[in-house]
């Protein structure tokens, strides 16, 4: 499917601490080098790149959630910090990862992963700033030593417009603005209201003065969809051969079964269900697209396809509707 599409960017995502670091009593105590070198998703990522060739560029996002550890962000120069860098370097050398990526993103939504309290305002901002600066400098040294050419981005900041008091956001932005080794900033825009598609970009450019490149490796309206997963089909259901009391998640389970059996519902029916609800953000993909163009977004990645037998085999009233953000809906429409 990727070969037949016009996709130009593919993003990979790896959680460094969960997969590749040893953790004892809230401390990073070592690196699982064998786990890195035998990590099957890494191999598949590289195989996909080689199959697609130069036509498609790959992005690697490194998730480093410090909230897993009691001391949040380790100090630069400590053994804990060095283990993080060691694991990253081994990963980049495994299967020639570094030679096959165009962009490396340091971090993933650090507002959530570096918070000291539940209001997401207070964080170990200065230590996180120091970490990112050191990380960018280490990556640059490795690039020079190994002939690697990927660009370094910081991020990925999420809900910037909703967290005006965050200590993490200005820390990340300062690294982007002041470290010459950092090419740009990654934004994740998971909007609750459609106007928020632009809010984060505008604030980053206007309030924080970021002039470097922007990319967006995640975007969705999942937060607008989740509260309605158990809504009834209502009059639409009656008109289309279902019961008025059937829930959206029940409908999704049913049409997934139909698609799997080779008798999928039509795309017209599928689309008309959501457009029958006043809460549904109509044309949200188009809205995001216009925002990306307006802010000259260098690279955008999102959910490409929803395939049968995905991570959420059966939906229920608590299922988060990430899969409704795909471009193709093989799971629902065959």
Name each model feature, range by range.
Residues 2-7, 291:
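A short, Lys/Arg-enriched amphipathic alpha-helix followed by its capping loop at the start of a domain
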Residues 5-159:
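Substrate-binding cleft and catalytic face of glycoside hydrolase catalytic domains
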Residues 10-14, 58-64, 91, 98-102, ...:
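Aromatic- and acid-rich polysaccharide-binding/catalytic face
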Residues 114-124, 184-192, 271-276:
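Surface-exposed cleft-lining segments at the edges of enzyme active sites
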Residues 192, 219-334:
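Substrate-binding cleft of secreted/luminal carbohydrate-active enzymes
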